[in-house]
């Protein structure tokens, strides 16, 4: 994970998981019992700060105590390997091994192809037959994450016996060996694990952003993980003892028939229900829970819970006794309200599903377990700046730069002193008439202040905004009078439209569109206003720019880091705005398709767009988001396929025209004759092949001894001839070398006073202009195809995150609303124009 404390995973632009909540490790580990891990899940795990295994420090990690299939020599393990792709590139190396005694028991070892992190290994054990036959309530074959992430944890059911019962300091943990961290476990006296034990894999991952991983009485910090990595098993013997102990304890606990997990499947977070177990591992149930209200709570606040139920007839005397409510890792008193109703207040808890039950002593449950959900606090829209000092100062800096550029780049004196063309004067008057509504804004602000309808801070913001609007109107009128020459930049190379886009001032788009200035104006780095709006995640600004005609398929100037440039979708993806990036990528492909259609390179329309316009109905929010994501992927895939087909067709036409240009009738006739010969030979190919095969079989069967002797004799004769020819060549070489030396010295040097053969230089052939132009075209086409592939990948990445689908849905609705507002604004502007003419 990144070190910024936000819990973002490294390499999110490759595997698609930005946070640990997106990765959902607990669900992934449950599903790993019945399926193999996906390449993007493996890449996300191996890229983080959580170290799984260091195969450079412990090279014998494959000697795990299992009996694997061997090669023919009987010593080496027979392993198959391949490379897995994450996206469009190979990034993971995987090795397979099958059991010798049990062929359905399989081991997979994964590590990254990246040289910087290739030493981290993830090992996955699974019995494929058990995963296909066992039910969802049983535990399948063991999954081994035998690495330094959890060095003091062996398995979920053995966690209380692996770690010491007393508090262990970081120094003690760093100095203990693997054998000292493990203690003998009595499998017969082992009790059924609780849900908290089963979820220990995900708790350290969720707490990794805070720098610690806690469980029970042991607290292991990130520094101790690195120390354990350095002080881990350094010999094959210690690692073998640890693996044998781990496998024996894991298998023993899994084969125990009394082990019945109390984990319920994850429910839909949008509609949680009170789900209980049909049976319980408790020897005798005292209290029967019928309802828990509420069924979920936010993880960052205290929550009051009402537990409703009834006591069994034989335990009615315990009605007013002191009971406890156990929720995850916390045990709080349960206050008696009335018969069968208890109230408790649970403290904040990390997000996830936990067990909730009543207990008499705070440990042993006396009721069935209820699955209670702690939800993460909803993240605010990324378009809204964070409420901290840095974001406020950054926004204020942009406002200062915009104000400075508007007030210092005025050319009123030059405009008034120069001769203004009638056309520019007429356009300036039109702009002034269309922007008269700003006077109404001033009047509304004065009335609001006098009537105390707005707060003081809102009044200041409105005043500042109106001042910028009026100054921008005057600035645009000056540029229209000058002939629309917008070459004003601030100290960092940004123009007015770029600063407005960075700040999210959507009102500036209407003024620029009315003035006739280009919305695709580039700054000194080649960025347009749409690039800046996408970079800062300004969804409303992006929608306004697209509605006003901004082009989403423009590319920034090339840099040393990115030779092909970046699109607006690439910039949004870099800052984590997946939904916005997918929407811009789709619009980029559609815009390029329409441009090529106008140019005559493509015919027809996109069928996906037609189907989307026809199939519009009312669906729930989640289904509508998924439907929009699927429609976007269909549109992007179809547009990319049509564009690539046009590229191939154009390249084929160019090759065909070049061939026709240099061809003549004689060559054409030869090609026709050659084609006829090929057709005639193809008709007789089958018969001739059978005859030749039969002849070769007969000859080899009859004369293989004679041929072998003949080949040996011929080989010896060839060697003798080669040796003789080499001897003659060496004799003649000395004579030729002496003759050339005499010729060079006598003739070229002494007589003609010139350089010898050593001074001869061959003139380099210069490339023709046509070849250079062709190379430039190929490079441009290759970069365009790469941009197409990136756009399709951006749209496809939405399916990895539900939040990205919701962001895409919100961006789509915002764009549709902006289009309606822009059309309404244009109609009002043209209506005023027609009324003035009348």
UniProtKB/Swiss-Prot annotation:
Q: Which residues form the IQ domain?
A: 671-700, 713-742, 788-817
In terms of Pfam families, this protein maps to: Ank_2 (PF12796), CG-1 (PF03859), IQ (PF00612), TIG (PF01833)
Reply yes or no: does the keyword Phosphoprotein apply.
no
User: Where is region (Calmodulin-binding) located?
Assistant: 738-760
Taxonomy, superkingdom: Eukaryota
Which tissues express it?
Answer: Expressed in roots, stems, leaves, sepals, petals, stamen filaments, top of carpels, anthers and siliques, but not in stigmas.
SUPFAM superfamilies assigned to the protein according to its UniProt record, in alphabetical order: Ankyrin repeat (SSF48403), E set domains (SSF81296)
Quote the InterPro entries the UniProt record gives. Answer: Ankyrin_rpt, Ankyrin_rpt-contain_sf, CG-1_dom, Ig-like_fold, Ig_E-set, IPT_dom, IQ_motif_EF-hand-BS
* A molecular function GO annotation: DNA binding
Record's note on what induces expression: By heat shock, UVB, salt, wounding, abscisic acid, H(2)O(2) and salicylic acid.
Q: Which residues bind DNA?
A: 25-134
Cellular component, GO annotation: nucleus
* GO biological process, alphabetically ordered: regulation of DNA-templated transcription; response to salt stress
Secreted among the record's keywords?
Answer: no
Give start and end residues of every ANK repeat: 525-554
- What keywords does the record list, in alphabetical order? Activator, ANK repeat, Calcium, Calmodulin-binding, Coiled coil, DNA-binding, Nucleus, Repeat, Stress response, Transcription
Q: Coiled-coil stretches, from where to where?
A: 802-822
Q: Where in the cell is it found?
A: Nucleus
Biological role stated in the UniProt entry: Transcription activator that binds calmodulin in a calcium-dependent manner in vitro. Binds to the DNA consensus sequence 5'-[ACG]CGCG[GTC]-3'. Regulates transcriptional activity in response to calcium signals.
Task: Give the family, as the similarity comment puts it.
Answer: Belongs to the CAMTA family.
Query: What is the protein name for this chain?
Result: Calmodulin-binding transcription activator 6
Q: What is the lineage of its organism?
A: Eukaryota, Viridiplantae, Streptophyta, Embryophyta, Tracheophyta
């Amino acid at each position: 994970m990144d070190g910024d404390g936000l819990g973002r995973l490294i390499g999110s632009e490759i595997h698609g998981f930005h946070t640990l909540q997106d990765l959902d490790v607990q669900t992934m580990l449950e599903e790993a019992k019945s399926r193999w891990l996906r390449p993007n899940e493996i890449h996300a795990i191996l890229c983080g700060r959580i170290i799984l295994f260091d195969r450079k420090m412990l090279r014998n990690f494959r000697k795990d105590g299992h009996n694997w299939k061997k090669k023919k020599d009987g010593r080496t393990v027979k392993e198959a390997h391949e490379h897995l792709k994450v996206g469009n590139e190979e990034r993971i190396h995987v090795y397979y091994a099958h059991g010798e005694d049990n062929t359905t028991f399989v081991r997979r070892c994964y590590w990254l192809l990246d040289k910087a992190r290739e030493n981290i290994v993830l090992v996955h054990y699974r019995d494929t037959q058990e995963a296909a036959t066992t039910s969802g309530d049983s535990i399948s074959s063991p999954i081994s994450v035998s690495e330094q992430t959890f060095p003091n944890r062996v398995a979920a059911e053995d966690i209380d016996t692996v770690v010491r019962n007393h508090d262990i300091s970081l120094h003690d943990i760093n100095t203990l060996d693997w054998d000292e961290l493990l203690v003998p476990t009595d499998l017969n006296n082992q009790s059924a694990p609780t849900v908290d034990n089963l979820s220990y894999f995900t708790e350290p991952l969720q707490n990794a952003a805070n720098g610690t991983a806690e469980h029970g009485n042991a607290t292991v910090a990130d520094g101790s993980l690195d120390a354990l990595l350095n002080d881990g098993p350094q010999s094959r013997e210690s690692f073998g003892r640890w693996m044998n102990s781990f496998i024996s304890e894991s298998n023993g606990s899994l084969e125990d028939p009394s082990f019945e997990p109390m984990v319920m499947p994850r429910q839909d977070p949008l509609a949680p229900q009170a789900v209980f177990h049909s049976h319980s591992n408790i020897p005798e149930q005292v209290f029967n829970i019928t309802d828990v209200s509420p069924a979920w709570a936010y993880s960052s606040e205290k929550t009051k819970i009402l537990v409703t139920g009834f006591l069994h007839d034989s335990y009615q005397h315990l009605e007013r006794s002191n009971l406890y409510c156990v929720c995850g890792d916390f045990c709080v008193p349960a206050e008696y309200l009335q018969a069968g109703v208890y109230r408790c207040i649970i403290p904040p808890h990390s997000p996830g599903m936990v067990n909730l039950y009543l207990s008499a002593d705070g440990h042993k449950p006396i009721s069935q377990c209820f699955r209670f959900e702690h939800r993460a606090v909803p993240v605010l829209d990324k378009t809204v700046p964070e409420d901290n000092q840095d974001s406020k100062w950054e926004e204020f800096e942009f406002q200062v730069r915009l104000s400075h550029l508007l007030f210092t780049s005025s050319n009123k004196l030059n405009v008034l002193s120069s001769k203004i063309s009638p056309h520019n004067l007429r356009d300036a008057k039109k702009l002034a008439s269309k922007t008269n509504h700003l006077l109404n804004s001033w009047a509304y602000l004065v009335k609001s202040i006098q009537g105390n309808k707005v707060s003081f801070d809102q009044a200041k913001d409105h005043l500042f905004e109106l001042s910028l609007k009026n100054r921008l109107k005057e600035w645009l009128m000056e540029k229209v009078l000058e002939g629309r020459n917008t070459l004003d930049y601030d100290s960092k190379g940004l123009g007015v439209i770029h600063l407005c886009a960075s700040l999210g001032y959507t009102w500036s788009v209407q003024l620029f569109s009315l003035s006739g200035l280009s919305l695709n104006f580039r700054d000194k780095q080649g960025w347009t206003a749409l690039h800046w709006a996408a970079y800062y995640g300004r969804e409303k600004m992006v929608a306004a720019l697209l509605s006003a005609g901004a082009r989403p398929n423009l590319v920034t100037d090339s840099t040393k880091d990115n030779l092909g440039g970046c699109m607006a979708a690439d910039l949004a993806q870099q800052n984590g705005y997946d939904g916005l990036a997918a929407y811009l990528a789709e619009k980029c492909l559609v815009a390029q398709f329409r441009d090529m259609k106008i140019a005559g390179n493509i015919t027809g329309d996109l069928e996906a767009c037609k189907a989307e316009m026809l199939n519009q109905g009312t669906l729930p929010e989640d289904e509508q988001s998924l439907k929009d994501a699927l429609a976007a992927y269909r549109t992007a895939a179809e547009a990319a396929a049509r564009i690539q087909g046009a590229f191939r067709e154009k390249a084929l036409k160019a090759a065909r025209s070049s061939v026709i240009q240099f061809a003549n009738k004689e060559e054409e006739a030869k090609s026709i004759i050659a084609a006829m010969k090929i057709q005639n030979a193809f008709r007789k190919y089958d018969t001739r092949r059978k005859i030749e095969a039969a002849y070769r079989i007969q000859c080899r069967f009859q004369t293989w001894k004679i041929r072998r002797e003949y080949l040996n004799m011929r080989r010896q004769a060839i060697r003798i001839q080669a040796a003789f020819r080499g001897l003659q060549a060496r004799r003649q070489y000395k004579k030729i070398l002496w003759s050339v030396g005499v010729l060079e010295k006598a003739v070229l040097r002494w007589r003609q006073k010139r350089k010898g053969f050593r001074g001869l230089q061959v003139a380099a052939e210069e490339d023709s202009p046509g070849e250079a132009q062709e190379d430039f075209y190929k490079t441009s086409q290759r970069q365009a195809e790469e941009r197409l592939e990136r756009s399709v990948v951006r749209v496809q990445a939405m399916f990895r995150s539900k939040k990205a689908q919701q962001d895409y849905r919100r961006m789509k609705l915002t764009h549709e609303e902006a289009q309606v507002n822009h059309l309404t604004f244009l109609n009002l502007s043209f209506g005023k124009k027609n009324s003035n003419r009348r």
